[in-house]
UniProtKB/Swiss-Prot annotation:
Protein name: Aspartate/glutamate leucyltransferase
GO cellular component, one term: cytoplasm
Domain of life where this protein originates: Bacteria
UniProt organism field: Polynucleobacter necessarius subsp. necessarius (strain STIR1)
Keyword Repressor recorded: no
Amino acid sequence: MTQLKELPLTTLQFYATAPYACSYLPNKTARSQVATPSHLIHADVYGDLLNAGFRRSGLYTYRPYCDECKACIATRILVNQFIPSRSQRRAQKKHAGLEVFVLNLGYQEEHYQLYQRYQHERHAGGDMDSDDQDQYMQFLLQSRVNSRIVEFRDGPHDPHPGRLRMVSMIDILEEGISSVYTFYDTSSHAASYGSYNILWQLEQARTLSLPYLYLGYYIKESDKMSYKIKYQPMEGLIDDHWQKLLGHNIYP
């Protein structure tokens, strides 16, 4: 892992959690390394942490710190080199009529209801399946960096104009956009909203002249996390260094 002494984070403290059941790989235990205190993790500091493999969940900033497993690999897409695949171009064309609204962080009941439906459909029985409003707000609406809510709604020529289809939370940092969390309408299983969201974020990063889109952790053996490798060229943080992630050099 990147040595913390190499980072300008002398005022932060770091601790390791006790082992807990892994959310992604069955019969595995996990640990996290947590950065604290949260009130000192502003945009510049969080950018350094992100480059060292950390992510945030609300005001909680962490990275995998497992004793033996190295399955979680922090990832980022090289924005200016990205070329969409055929299926990604189809998703882009399919949803070109969606209207996009970029908002400041704030609670909206419509967002929360979509979040609940998404969790019940896609992650039934998971840690977030029963999140109440307070848990939802702590997870997605608390931030000390430049964060935004992105709404995707049906356009005026769709059968249901204005219908909320997807919500994405993003952080806009000095070196890139970090995709925090996305949830969407699951009523159409072939909708490919998630793919369209990543393509939209890539385009926004390109517009802002930002070199990277950070997608979080890639886990080869997890269906929930393995899709990220489809967005190339991608870099992964392996053995303390960002390097091209092509599939052949990934931990099993």
